[in-house]
Each structure stands twice: as structure tokens, then as C-alpha cells.
Amino acid sequence: MIVCFITFTIFHKNRIELAHQNRIGAKKKFAIHDYSKEKEQQDDDDDPDYLVSAIPEDTPHIPYKPLARPMEKILERSREYYDLMAKRRTVRSFSTEPIPQEVLDNIVKTAGTSPSGAFTEPWTFVVVQDPEVKLAIRNIIEDEEEINYSRRMSRQWVTDLKPFATNHIKPYLTDAPALILVFRQTYSWRADGKKKMHYYNEISVAIACGFLLAAIQYCGLVALTSTPLNCNTRLRDLLSRPPNERLELLLPVGKPHEDVTVPDIKRKNLDEIMINV
């Protein structure tokens, strides 16, 4: 369910941003690195020298022996895991207590175990703990969100958000001890300089985000799933990310504030989301 929500949100956000950029004729500028000499994206399928697999064709296949468990134990673990994940909530008020670096390393490593199209692993996880950088991120997002709420977002969209008590002011971006920004790599470059396509990069990154949220919940932290509208270029420049990367998700991560509250809402029942055939 986490993955489905993230996938829909990412696709919806991308369509809105693309439409907006087309209207305003937005031009991308990269303040930190000079990518002016970057090779143009082109289809090299007609070039015989290009038709080399992303990983060696003779990559050996090895036995796979996951831990064997009796079905009774599998059932027990499925119940325990559901009970844990059912407690996950989106939180907008965070404790400022720092997170050990090893915890952040482990949850990102867990996200990196996600499957991806043709094993391209098209993701970059930028973990921000520096207070000045967090403030710069907050300023960018609040600038754009003020415009989003007043002009870009439909009245129905804004109305639908009212029960969640959210607006263009985002204190959690500086309160949370860490921000994890997930960037999607649309392509990369092979060692020989040829472009390496990242197939199904959107769904691959969406699945990885689901893994990331599950890891955050499992270790006892909380997060907010945020998809900053029209912030991609400015945040990418701020964090020195290359032009083949696009921001897909921003997660403030930490412990919940001691006075945090969440909306009293219920998830759909199993019979509303599952069909057995």
C-alpha cells in the first residue's frame, strides 16, 4: 500500500510539474557544476557498439537459499509485521534529537536492496543534517509552496488538505534531525561514455521509497512523505545533483515530538483493497 501511494503521488506530481514548466517555458540552470559539455541524450540503438548489456552477459548465476521457515512461523511473522506497519503514521512535528549516522546508513542501505528495472538501481539518496542546508531547503520549498497554495493547486486540492492542517509553512524541514531527498536517475553513463538507460526508473524508485519508509518504521522513527511541487531544479542545484536526476520524494525523518498529534482517520478494510481470484 505504501508503494502504491508513493507511485501515484510521484506520477501525479511529475505531470503537474511538466505542465507548469511547459506553460512558463522554464529553463534549467545548474549553479554548482558545469554540465554544458554533457553529451546530448540520444538513441544509440542503431549503433552496434552500443548494444552491450549493462552488466556482463556472462554474469554467473549462483544458488539462492533464503532462510527456510515453517509455515506457522511465516504466518506469525506476517502478523507481527502487519501490526508494526499498521502503526505507521505521517508526522508533521518532530523531536530535534539527532539520529545516529549508522541508523541513517542502515535505512538507506535497506532502500538500496529494492528491485529495479534491468538492475539499474536508478536512485540517489541525499541525507541532509547540516542546519544551514536544511534552512536553505525550507526557504526554497516555502517560497514555491506559497505560490502552489495560492495559484498552482486547485481549490479542491487545497480543500482536501485542510483536515491535515498543512499549509505553505514547513517547520518540520528544520526541526527534523535529518532530511532524506530521493532523486530518480533517468539515465547514467557507461564506462565507455555511452548512455546507460534506466528502464522503469519511476516505478523502481517508487518501490525503493516504500522500502525506505518500511525501514524507518521498523527501527522506530517517523517520517513525512513530501513531494515538493516545482522545487526540483532549485533543490537539485542546491545539492549539486546532475541533470539526469530528478527529485521524487523528500522525507523529514526523526523521532516524533512529544506533543505530536495525527488525524483520527482509518485505512480501508482488506475487502476494499484486495481481490482474490
Outline where the language-model segments fall.
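Glycine-rich phosphate/pyrophosphate-binding beta-alpha loops
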Residues: 115-119
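Short, electropositive alpha-helical surface patch
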Residues: 234-248
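C-terminal helix-cap and adjacent tail motif
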Residues: 8-17, 27-44, 51-64, 69, ...
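Glycine-rich, charged/polar anion/phosphate-binding loops
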Residues: 110-112, 163-168, 235-237, 260
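Glycine/small-residue-rich phosphate/adenosyl-binding loop
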Residues: 40, 51-54, 121-205
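Small-aliphatic-rich amphipathic alpha-helix that forms the alpha element of a beta-alpha
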Residues: 88, 107-112, 186-237
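Generic N-terminal amphipathic, Lys/Arg-enriched alpha-helix
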Residues: 61-67, 82-97
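An N-terminal domain-cap segment
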Residues: 91-114
